[in-house]
């Protein structure tokens, strides 16, 4: 199952959170959902050079709060915050409510699946050999602390007549393990031979190790206490 299902969707509510966090009644739900789609589409189009990994949207009390995770915060903010203010006004027009923009810097962009997939796609569009592009990305990710990475490309690779799929993996990528922090993303390279799909899985480590150990330890202590009481009662 873990091999087929979306890695991020399978872990929602366990170790991952939603990208849109708000509540709405039946009347407003579809409008808010469509509004989130339009806001994300606009921001990703405007900030294509800012290396945006993900956009989190919250809706507190008739307003909207947008958090942009980017590897280049200076590109978004601009001189003295001029660019971000213009961006906030445009997002406010799209959403129709007061808007607050937060910028969060990504310290290690080499471990973000979205940025890695976009990087490979851009190299393929520049006619870089796909094996070379994949190895560059994999080596940089493993060097900066990734526990494992898997990259899959599919399409008319290197202009071949018949489309095929090739993948490369280094390290561990445990897709069946819920506590495994796996970042997944998909991108497309539009080449002269057609569209080439790029999928990236990045395993960053296990999140719930300490919590699970604590729970197991407490269970053992409860069993030990129960066995001690039982022995005393027999005596």
UniProtKB/Swiss-Prot annotation:
CDD domains in UniProt: KH-II_30S_S3
GO MF annotations, alphabetized: mRNA binding; rRNA binding; structural constituent of ribosome
InterPro entries, A to Z: KH_dom, KH_dom-like_a/b, KH_dom_type_2, KH_sf_prok-type, Ribosomal_S3_C_sf, Ribosomal_uS3_bac-typ, Ribosomal_uS3_C, Ribosomal_uS3_CS
One BP annotation, GO: translation
PROSITE patterns hit by this protein: KH_TYPE_2, RIBOSOMAL_S3
SUPFAM superfamilies: Prokaryotic type KH domain (KH-domain type II) (SSF54814), Ribosomal protein S3 C-terminal domain (SSF54821)
Domain KH type-2: 39-107
Annotated Gene Ontology cellular component terms: cytosolic small ribosomal subunit
Gene3D superfamilies according to UniProt: 3.30.300.20, Ribosomal protein S3, C-terminal domain
This protein's UniProt keywords: Ribonucleoprotein, Ribosomal protein, RNA-binding, rRNA-binding
One Pfam family here: KH_2
Family according to the record: Belongs to the universal ribosomal protein uS3 family.
Chain's role: Binds the lower part of the 30S subunit head. Binds mRNA in the 70S ribosome, positioning it for translation.
Subunit: Part of the 30S ribosomal subunit. Forms a tight complex with proteins S10 and S14.
NCBIfam families, per database record: rpsC_bact
Cross-referenced PANTHER family: 30S/40S RIBOSOMAL PROTEIN S3, SMALL RIBOSOMAL SUBUNIT PROTEIN US3C
Name of this protein: Small ribosomal subunit protein uS3
Species for this entry: Blochmanniella floridana
């Amino acid at each position: 199952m873990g091999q087929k299902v979306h890695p991020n969707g399978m872990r929602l509510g366990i170790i991952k959170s939603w990208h849109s966090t708000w509540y709405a009644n039946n009347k407003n739900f579809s409008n808010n959902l469509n509004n989130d789609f339009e806001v994300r589409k606009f921001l990703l189009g405007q900030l294509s050079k800012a290396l945006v990994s993900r956009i989190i949207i919250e809706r507190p009390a008739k307003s909207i709060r947008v958090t942009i995770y980017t590897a280049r915060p200076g590109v978004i903010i601009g001189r003295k915050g001029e660019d971000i203010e213009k961006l906030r006004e445009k997002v406010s027009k799209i959403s129709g409510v007061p808007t607050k923009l937060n910028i969060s810097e990504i310290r290690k962009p080499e471990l973000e699946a979205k940025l890695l997939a976009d990087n490979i796609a851009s190299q393929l569009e520049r006619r870089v050999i796909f094996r070379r592009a994949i190895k560059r990305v994999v080596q940089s990710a493993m060097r900066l602390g990734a526990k494992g990475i898997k990259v899959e490309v599919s399409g008319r690779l290197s202009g071949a007549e018949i489309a095929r799929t090739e993948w490369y993996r280094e390290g561990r990528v445990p897709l069946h393990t819920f506590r495994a922090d796996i970042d997944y993303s998909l991108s497309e390279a539009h080449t002269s031979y057609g569209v080439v799909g790029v999928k990236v899985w990045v395993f960053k480590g296990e999140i719930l190790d300490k919590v699970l150990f604590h729970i197991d330890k407490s269970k053992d202590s409860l069993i030990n206490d129960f066995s001690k009481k039982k022995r005393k009662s027999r005596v």
